[in-house]
């Protein structure tokens, strides 16, 4: 009854307020991915202004946290933190603290110091480090090498050779920042997406948003459709940034223990309260394996997930109802 009433109210609003508009915008090239914003606005001008504000915020976050921009705050940290404590902005400090918390919760499966080896990969040019190069750089991977001083608001590295990359969490953070901007403008129905990371507020025309999870090998095939309202969702897959060589796939999600591409799942979709959280936790299944990851997500309590194993088996957390015929954890 409550859902029916909500739908009738939404339809009534559509019929009565001819000024209200549903707006959509897609922008490429921000944070190295595609950004999409959808929202229900009181009028077209205010809606477009809100979208522009979100895109500007995405560019700002990228300018701070990109490792591809030598002048970014994160690049400065990587250049100096092995030698001296580096004072950083509250935003970067808090995100680093969050990332380290995820590392502790996942027992190191999520680790931003993967970049100590990861920087040697170039997936566009099909470049990978040799085993010798990996072994030489591997001691730099350990989240405990990243030392934060909250009172001084500094970060330093415990040893030379440490590099960090926030690629596993920064897009989710940018999505959350975009949503905060929209909510600050009074927008109650919207979606912000950066690559595989999305956050949803409210509904879409009185109905839940329907999010499809693609098959790892067949991009036009959907393995599950999930109705969402007021949730974040992140999907990570070994089909995003990769190259194949001699029958082996090298992709961007690395196992911190080996410096090699993690291969225990093909795809991980995580649903939770914020995109920062789902972005970070979606990577961990590749390292932990599907069964251990499901156990972790259910223990956390605010996370649901759909995982695709290498053999095609699909596992779900208990909070999700799997499609008929699917194999469930």
Give the predicted meaning of each segment:
Residues 2-6, 16-329:
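Mature catalytic core of soluble alpha/beta enzymes
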């Amino acid at each position: 009854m409550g859902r029916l009433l909500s739908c009738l109210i939404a339809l009534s609003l559509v019929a009565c307020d001819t000024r209200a508009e549903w707006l959509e915008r897609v922008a490429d090239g921000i944070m190295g991915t595609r950004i999409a914003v959808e929202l229900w606005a009181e009028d077209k001008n205010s809606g477009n202004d809100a979208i522009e504000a979100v895109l500007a915020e995405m560019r700002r976050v990228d300018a701070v946290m990109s490792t591809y921009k030598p002048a970014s705050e994160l690049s400065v940290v990587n250049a100096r933190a092995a030698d001296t404590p580096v004072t950083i902005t509250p935003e970067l400090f808090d995100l680093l603290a969050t990332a380290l918390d995820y590392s502790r919760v996942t027992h190191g499966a999520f680790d931003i110091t993967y970049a100590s080896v990861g920087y040697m990969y170039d997936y566009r040019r099909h470049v990978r480090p040799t085993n010798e190069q990996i072994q030489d750089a591997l001691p730099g991977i350990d989240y405990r090498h990243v030392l934060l001083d909250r009172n001084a608001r500094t970060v330093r590295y415990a040893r030379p050779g440490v590099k960090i990359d926030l690629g596993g969490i920064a897009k989710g953070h940018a999505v959350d920042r975009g949503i905060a901007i929209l909510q600050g403008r009074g927008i109650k129905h919207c979606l912000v997406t950066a690559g595989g990371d999305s956050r949803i507020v409210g509904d879409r025309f009185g109905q839940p948003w329907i999010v499809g999870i693609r098959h790892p090998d067949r991009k036009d095939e959907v393995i599950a459709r999930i109705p969402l309202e007021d949730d974040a969702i992140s999907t990570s897959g070994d089909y995003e940034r990769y190259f194949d060589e001699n029958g082996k796939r090298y992709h961007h999600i690395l196992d911190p223990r080996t410096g090699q591409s993690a291969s225990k799942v093909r795809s991980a979709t995580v649903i939770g309260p914020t995109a920062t959280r789902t972005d970070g936790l979606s990577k961990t299944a590749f390292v932990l394996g599907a069964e251990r990851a499901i156990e972790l997500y259910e223990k956390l309590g605010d996370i649901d997930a759909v995982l695709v194993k290498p053999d095609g088996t699909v596992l779900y957390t208990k909070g999700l109802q799997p499609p008929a015929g699917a194999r469930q954890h």
